[in-house]
Amino acid sequence: MTINLVPLLLSLITIFTIFNPSALADQSQIRSTTSQWLHFSEDLSQSTIEVSIPTIIAAVLSFFAASISSAGGIGGGGLFLSIMTIIAGLEMKTASSFSAFMVTGVSFANVGCNLFLRNPKSRDKTLIDFDLALTIQPCLLLGVSIGVICNRMFPNWLVLFLFAVFLAWSTMKTCKKGVSYWNLESERAKIKSPRDVDGIEVARSPLLSEEREDVRQRGMIRFPWMKLGVLVIIWLLFFSINLFRGNKYGQGIISIKPCGALYWFLSSLQIPLTIFFTLCIYFSDNVQSNHTSHSNQNSEQETGVGGRQNKLMLPVMALLAGVLGGLFGIGGGMLISPLLLQIGIAPEVTAATCSFMVLFSSSMSAIQYLLLGMEHAGTAAIFALVCFVASLVGLMVVKKVIAKYGRASIIVFAVGIVMALSTVLMTTHGAFNVWNDFVSGRYMGFKLPC
């Protein structure tokens, strides 16, 4: 019973923080100090947006979007971006910064709830698969950087076309995978033992289960602090490169000419870093054995992919997902989750691991936006807290539903719903923008990256 009250207490504390004027004042003071140190105080001239009907509607819709996204372990950036541009009426640049903060809020709540839970198939491991994260994260971050450059070069109509085609295909594959898991759970429920009164003991694979009590009874699980440390080092290295390099407007810790020789040199440093960490992880015996066990566990789902083949495929898949995520401006979580499901990773492990990786990428973007002087940072923080609370609520609801009905497949369906809504909303909004560019006679061809 105590475990169930933890998310509720976190929610109450968060709500108190949102509506506490002194807390907001402290946040403004911190932002002011940081911006003065970085000489970007002029960019924070307007820290909050005036409360209006569209803003309130956007907050309510963001709450529901975060609740659904948290179940699938994806950040929900596609939904947040659409809500902030269509409903709140923000410009795309401002909406992107808001989306980064909101995705960080969702992912932080998700990771906090899943960090010390047990893997349902490996009782001595955490629900978050750190081996998967180590294999995927370097290539995912590199792919995002490449995708951002491609986004500057490609015309809007091409980006929109690629976005619609790829997400429609991914949504279809995800929904099919969800149906497959649903049928598998139904078959397991039919052959359950008669002693299972509630009829869910065989099929249950909860995203949020009563594992913390189980941990107390059986002893602590082996938390991979070393692997977490490696991931933090990777995050810090990529973050430092992006922070020193700055953006295309020349905003950075040091003064660098946008798209100059030093700019591209710092950008290219991400390539050897990615190759180094990927090769080290690939030839790691510890990670290799864990991926082999993954393949053995998922053989009953007919993945047909060996452990070493999985390790070879995952970096390539992560690089592709990162490129597309950076190209579309939605991050890699919505793209990497369907790929992990397709190779047979369990839904609850996929959700927990994806939310962990999304936290790394979204927090990197959010901190860069903040340090480089974003507009309306106060309002963005409030929206992030709203999404944090919504994520906790969504996780509690999913926990109860899975525990009652034994349907972990609802995680897959949640991913499909978010992807379908994002595809429809962003494609529609993008189509109007492309049409406006066409009728106004704007240039619609390829551009230079600078």
Swiss-Prot record:
The keyword Membrane applies. Keywords: Membrane, Transmembrane, Transmembrane helix, Transport. It comes from the Eukaryota. It is a multi-pass membrane protein. It is found in: Membrane. The chain crosses the membrane at residues 5-25, 48-68, 70-90, 97-117, 130-150, 153-173, 223-243, 261-281, 316-336, 340-360, 378-398, 408-428. Belongs to the 4-toluene sulfonate uptake permease (TSUP) (TC 2.A.102) family. InterPro entries: TM_pro_TauE-like. One of its GO terms (cellular component) is membrane. This is Sulfite exporter TauE/SafE family protein 1. The keyword Transmembrane applies. Its main location: membrane. It comes from Arabidopsis thaliana.
